């Protein structure tokens, strides 16, 4: 989580960029409304990343041994127990955990941050910025909290944060490592130094940071970090919270149930210490093993490999989009020193949902549209109506980026070939002849519906 400048082994944004690692679905063929198929260009890594081939291989390898853990005498149970605890150690090593830190497996980042919210001391506020994903905003609203408005520069934002910490005691500062909307990295090390100066701890929402940058709790001094397997090339249902033991040992158990206790009577319970205290029920052993395999694979890459690969693709994408009339790429800060490869843009006079539907239906490109579970940030950017987000990862190649830029340029210059209508808040091709696999069910046109999208019927050609 340290800022650094790439001074060697860089790629030119005009060079052909190949995938850094093998991912499942890299050669997936997607049908087009205009007929035929194209290789799916997955530019939606920030939402959920595909499984690394190495992760899928690991899951297939351990699956025959799957069994209930911790108290089974059978051989498979002993293997599964050893696998779970080895996975715990691997994930801790991935984030540079301190010797006394606890690794708690959860469902995802949202789950992990809600868990921590139930373990906070009651003597101070939680402080966060208005640029956070809802997962790092809503859990803190249940208790004493303060929101600091981010300024137009990181320097001014740090000043505002220090003013808030000086003004009133805070128990925790909750900060994102990298914006899920713009990709801009926040200076975690400096935030930690500020928070500790005023007696507050820091939790880092690393959902976006973990797949793209090295994390080191010892070096940064951050107290807690949370991230998800499904964004870190291990979409098997596991997430994690890693951090200091004392709050987790004293906090309210996240779920009440078997495995989280030392002793139970009909009217009282003695809870176990963390991590068991917060892992009631049968754990997701395969999810933990998958997350550990992803961590091992990413950690084995050369130090700057991720940054070099992403920097070339991001620059290629931003340069291409900003070269199209009527297209604007959005950012929060004027002085962000670095960004992960997440780019949010709008097309003048074209609804973001229509842009995304067009890219999918006519060009086989997957992007995200909407408000990205960050309503306050989209509002401050003037994008309450939504935007389009393109994001890359280890399986992305330069051809994916080039296809997106070409498709957006064609949309601006000539418009879509097909007719589209807004159905229950989502733009969809009308008609939509693309078949779904038989095992997927018949939900064509409704797969993108969301409770936070409320728009009336519209048609566009």
Q: Which residues does each predicted region cover?
A:
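Pyridoxal 5′-phosphate
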Residues: 1-461
